[in-house]
């Protein structure tokens, strides 16, 4: 019986799973969207959504809790200064999982894209300005 056993094991040890989701969370918060398997995307939501909720609280304790998960001061700064303000007034549903039509070549795994529903506004104009110069 699987009573009170939440989360998928994904055929990995607990330390491997922790490292996997830490790296995936870093990638999602850095790039805004990533392509992965459906199962990993759905499990990643359980890590990223509480991080964005911490960013909405925006106090020192929340920053320290986010650093525990992310392990990067630059990413914590980006989370609290850029990503968090984009979600002010939103009470949940910070990420979206979109299933892709074609499975992965090789092992036929179903693929999905996980993305942030609100992209930080400060990013895009700065990149376009750099490209124009």
UniProtKB/Swiss-Prot annotation:
Species assigned in the record: Nitratidesulfovibrio vulgaris (strain DSM 19637 / Miyazaki F)
Protein name: Large ribosomal subunit protein bL17
Residues spanning the membrane: none
Superkingdom field: Bacteria
HAMAP family for the chain: Ribosomal_bL17
Keywords carried by this UniProt record: Ribonucleoprotein, Ribosomal protein
One GO MF term attached to the UniProt entry: structural constituent of ribosome
InterPro entries: Ribosomal_bL17, Ribosomal_bL17_sf
Family named by the database record: Belongs to the bacterial ribosomal protein bL17 family.
One Pfam family from the record: Ribosomal_L17
Keyword DNA-binding assigned: no
GO CC term (a single one): cytosolic large ribosomal subunit
Complex formation: Part of the 50S ribosomal subunit. Contacts protein L32.
GO biological process terms on file: translation
């Amino acid at each position: 019986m699987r009573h009170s056993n939440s989360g998928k094991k994904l055929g990995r040890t607990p330390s491997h799973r922790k490292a996997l989701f830490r790296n995936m969370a870093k990638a999602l918060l850095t790039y805004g969207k990533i392509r992965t398997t459906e199962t990993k995307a759905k499990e990643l939501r359980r890590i990223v959504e509480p991080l964005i909720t911490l960013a909405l609280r925006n106090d020192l304790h929340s920053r320290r809790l986010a650093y525990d998960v992310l392990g990067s001061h630059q990413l914590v700064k980006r989370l609290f200064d850029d990503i968090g303000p984009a979600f002010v007034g939103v009470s949940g549903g910070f990420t979206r999982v979109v299933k892709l039509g074609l499975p992965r070549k090789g092992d036929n795994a179903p693929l999905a894209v996980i993305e942030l529903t609100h992209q930080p506004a400060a990013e895009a104009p700065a990149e376009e300005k750099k490209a124009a110069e």
